[in-house]
Amino acid sequence: MSCATDTVATLMRAADLARRRMNAVVEPHGLTLQQYNVLRILRGAGADGVPTLEVANRMIEQTPGITRLLDRLEQKELIKRQRCIKDRRQHLCWITPKGLALLQKIDAPFAQTHEETLKGLRRKDRAAFTRLLGALHAAHA
């Protein structure tokens, strides 16, 4: 195998490991990782809300079904949506108090899972790893 093949295969195995560990945290709460990601985006937006298209653009994993994803979260009363007053073609999204409470339950176990997933890397190695992954992402964005 080439070095590039080995590198990509290792990256994919590491991503799968991280995804499985994070799924184990959110699934007992009735969430997918994509739904969790939406809730985090909306929590960060605060009271201003976020247009649907911006939520889609800020997702870690891009999804063509952002409307269905938001529908499910709205059915669970974790988010609310409202037509934008300035541009009636857009909908703004907010996290609800119920959504915030759910994230608060998940935050500590999620952070612990991140630490456990990265336990083989020292802090300076983590920083270098983050820079390398950022460069890889930027080259293809």
List the predicted regions and their residue ranges.
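Short alpha-helical elements of helix-turn-helix
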Residues: 5-9, 32-40, 67
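A short acidic, leucine-rich amphipathic alpha-helix
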Residues: 54-56
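Charged, amphipathic alpha-helical coiled-coil/dimerization segments
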Residues: 71-131
